[in-house]
Design a protein with these regions (language model features):
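Extracellular and secretory-pathway beta-repeat/beta-biased strand scaffolds
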Residues: 2-698
């Protein structure tokens, strides 16, 4: 879906009436700034009875006349051609009564605009419609007093049935009120390219709406909303009022004679090569016909959206296919929405960072997948939100970047359930709220939150060797040298806090998705494994720290099963709840090894601790020592009888100690500390309760 923007009492919003369908994730190849052979055709009025008059005065084209609606608030123009060369000005003449100026281009050629578009004499919104395509060159600029929209729609609707048609006749007198629909009769719809610097005034809105939209230049709407959207062909886009969503109606609007419209827009490659001249657009067409942005390896297809530089109060970028963000700088003081029917693709480079900073909520949805790789700039966190940060997909969420949220952070599927994510190189997540995700598979992971953490199964596959973790991070060594997992909930101070001015956040009410499910500052995850199946590579340490409760399934930092000759060491397992309870009864806690050494297991809670089997062992007779197992409950009880209910530290050499200390009752199964060269001490101490070992042996 696309989010909404305010425009002097009108909200422009675009959304799908149904879930975006799943489409192929495959992309062609992309590349960067190149001179594109396009030539601006002069501004020529259409001879169709609309009454548009164009007067040339040096480099300025004064646009007057036209047709008015019956209430004189909407002014309509019709052009055979509309283009500007460098240094030229299109001057739309208005008056204080005119709220909207709408211009159409009917000649069948794309508009090549490499000069200035302005409105004088009134504070009118300006709509420019050319179904054949619109190109803003590197020298394109705006000087408009209100909102601006460029669209390749074939019609702009007023009310339920009145249309400003892109071709044919119009009943201008009946086109009253505010434009609220946009018809795209052609498939694919025409393309829009912006290589210029398009800027509207403070509080005004800027919209680029087409079949494919590529903005390699700058778009700015300080205090207003930017919408950049590629829509499917043969759709009707409806404008909604605040609080509602807009639909893409499945119908094929025709012209008044019932015939298909008389042009076929050029695709992106045809638009770039078909009209001669030289306008810098930031695009090139390869010999195989693929369109490329400079400096990347991802191509641009029909219905894609590409955006490079966006600055606004709020912004929505929405693609009917892929949303491609290469070296982009996207900055809003309010919400930022990044949406794709297929894939949201993000890349930085060694030369240029990727930045998506939202003063309020940052929402990223790729229906098929989210593909993020932005690790080249250690000093700058790519994804930062003052409010909540959401990554939503029914496919894989690949998050090789650092994420910092001033609210909660959630990785979800389209149904709102926790979504799975992977990272091949380096994920760091920091949230001033809750963190929610499904299963994780990837390299060493750190998640820190002032709220709670809820996750699925976690598999750590290697150390983080990307070089993108700041050396100032207190877990730098663990993360960069081992298969480490670090989950920290209920923190008062984040190691990697979001860096946004407080004024950007405003009065956002941050939502806590876990507040009804877990006590604040809790951790609940599925099975955890940091085990290594590669000889000579140790298993990673596991650290879970929370203010509230901690609940887990299996917790494995052992050498992988079946690797009998592995000389790996197991990792240490540390689970600490500063104010709640610990429950690992749904699985085993295992820090065993084959030939190497077993890891230490430490469980410490303010309240009760409930466990199943706890293992630190060494299998082979030529192996090392087993680790210590320490369980401490400061104000609660300890019960280790779930499942098999065993506590074992066993090794052919020495074993560690076993220590259980609680304020309340202690109930155990079998406890063993057995080593050929000496077993460790077993200590069981209850300060105010009873000790029951009847369920096993010591």
């Amino acid at each position: 879906m696309l989010r909404m923007s305010q425009s002097k009492g009108t909200v422009w919003a675009i959304a799908s009436s149904r879930r975006f369908s799943q489409v192929s994730v495959l992309l062609p190849i992309l590349g960067i700034l190149a001179a594109t052979p396009l030539q601006a055709r002069p501004i020529t009025p259409a001879v169709d009875g609309t009454g548009t008059v164009v007067t040339k005065d040096g480099n300025r084209f004064d646009i007057n006349g036209g047709s008015l609606s019956s209430d004189s608030t909407n002014l309509f123009h019709s052009f055979e051609e509309f283009g500007l060369s460098e240094g030229q000005i299109a001057n739309f003449l208005s008056n204080p009564q005119i709220q909207n100026i709408l211009g159409r281009v009917v000649g069948g050629d794309a508009s090549i605009i490499n000069g200035l578009i302005q409105v004088t004499g009134g504070n009118s919104n300006l709509f420019l419609m050319n179904p054949a395509g619109i190109v803003f060159g590197a020298n394109a600029r705006l000087n408009v007093p209100a909102d601006f929209m460029a669209t390749t729609a074939t019609g702009i609707g007023f009310g339920d049935k009145n249309w400003f048609n892109g071709f044919g006749s119009n009943d201008y007198l009946n086109l009253v009120g505010t434009p609220n629909r946009f018809a795209f009769d052609l498939s694919p719809g025409g393309s829009i390219i912006n290589a210029g610097n398009l800027r509207v005034g403070r509080g005004d809105n800027l919209t680029l709406l087409g079949g494919t939209v590529v903005s390699s230049g700058q778009v700015s709407a300080p205090g207003g909303e930017i919408t950049i959207s590629a829509v499917p062909g043969e759709r009707l886009v409806r404008v909604s009022q605040p609080g509602s969503m807009l639909s893409l109606e499945i119908e094929l609007p025709r012209d008044q004679d019932g015939l298909l419209l008389p042009i076929k827009p050029l695709d992106l490659a045809g638009l770039l090569t078909g009209q001669g001249g030289n306008v810098e657009t930031g695009l090139r067409v390869n010999s195989d016909g693929n369109v490329q942005l400079a400096g990347s390896d991802f191509g641009v297809r029909n219905r894609d959206v590409v955006a490079k530089n966006v600055t606004a109060q709020t912004a929505t970028l929405s693609a009917a296919n892929n949303l491609i963000l290469v070296e982009s700088r996207l900055q809003t003081r309010g919400d930022l929405n990044l949406l794709a029917r297929n894939t949201v693709l993000v890349r930085d480079s060694v030369a240029n960072p990727f930045v998506a900073h939202a003063g309020r909520n940052l929402y990223i949805q790729g229906n098929r997948s989210i593909d993020i790789l932005a690790l080249n700039h250690v000093s700058q966190t790519p994804f930062v939100s003052g409010g909540n940060l959401s990554l939503v997909s029914n496919g894989i969420i690949s998050g090789d970047a650092h994420f910092a949220s001033g609210g909660s952070l959630a990785m979800l599927n389209l149904s709102g359930e926790p979504g799975n994510f992977v990272s091949l190189y380096d994920p760091i997540i920091s949230a001033n709220g809750d963190v929610v995700f499904g299963n994780y598979n990837g390299v060493a992971l750190k998640v820190e939150a002032t709220g709670s953490i809820s996750g699925g199964d976690i598999v750590i596959t290697g150390a983080d060797t990307s070089g993108s973790i700041p050396t100032t991070d207190p877990h730098y060594t663990e993360l960069t040298t081992s298969r480490a997992l670090i989950l920290q909930a209920g923190k008062t101070t984040l190691d990697n806090a979001p860096n946004l001015p407080q004024s950007s956040v405003g009065e956002t009410n941050f939502t806590s998705p876990l507040e009804d499910l877990l006590p604040r500052g809790s951790i609940q995850v599925g099975n955890i494994t940091t085990q290594s199946g590669v000889n000579g590579i140790d298993s990673g340490s596991i650290t879970l720290e929370a203010l509230g409760n901690i609940i887990t399934g299996n917790v494995f930092s052992r050498t992988a099963g079946g690797v009998f000759n592995s000389q790996n060491n197991a990792g240490n397992i540390t689970i600490i709840s500063r104010g709640g309870s610990i429950d690992t009864s749904a699985g085993s806690v295992d820090a065993g090894a084959s030939i190497g050494s077993g890891g230490n297991i430490t469980l410490m809670a303010q309240k009760d601790i409930t466990t199943s089997t706890l293992f630190s062992y060494v299998i082979r007779s030529d192996g090392g020592s087993a680790g210590n197992i320490n369980i401490t409950s400061k104000e609660g009880s300890i019960n280790t009888t779930a499942g098999n209910g065993q506590i074992l530290t066993v090794a052919p050499q020495k074993t560690g100690q076993v220590m259980l200390i609680a304020s309340g009752d202690i109930t155990t199964g079998t406890i063993s500390s057995d080593g050929n060269l000496g077993g460790g001490d077993i200590t069981i101490k209850s300060e105010n309760g009873s000790i029951n070992t009847a369920a096993g042996t010591l």
